[in-house]
Amino acid sequence: TKTKKIIKNIKVNWKGSTGIHTHDNMGKALENSIEAINNSVNWIDCTVTGMGRGPGNTKTEYLILELKRKNEKSEKLVHLLNLIKNYFEPLKDKYKWGSNPFYYFAGLNSIHPSFVQGMLGDDSFQPEDIYSNLNYLSTVGGKKFSDELISLGKNFYKKVIKGSWKPVNLIKDK
């Protein structure tokens, strides 16, 4: 896998401890973290419910369940599950973090996740607007984030006209 190749290349010249921090844009954060464990990475960066910017990171609770399958200790899992239910889920609902189809589409098309984050945080963007803008970004290139590109998409749907050229001026006085 790509994760295995990256770890192998790092370990050629680095003999110290290694770790991994994965994002969940395409739903592979856990898979890549497990692959890292299987390739002797020393630490895995994870967050409760995957809390993080945009689609988030490897979910601690999922990683614990995977490690439990490998006979690792996980006696504190019930405490973590209660913490999630009572504190993290309400925050997740309030601040709307986590994976969704828009982040996945962005990942498939090498679009910077800040585009998705910006549109999701703006109530004037409806799902069809977000999807249409992401389709546009997939054709013009969205690897580098730009507020201007989000504004263009927003203005397109709001019918805000920018510029001074008017076709009526071409036929005026004729």
What is each model feature region?
Residues 1-174:
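Catalytic cores and adjacent flexible loops of soluble metabolic enzymes
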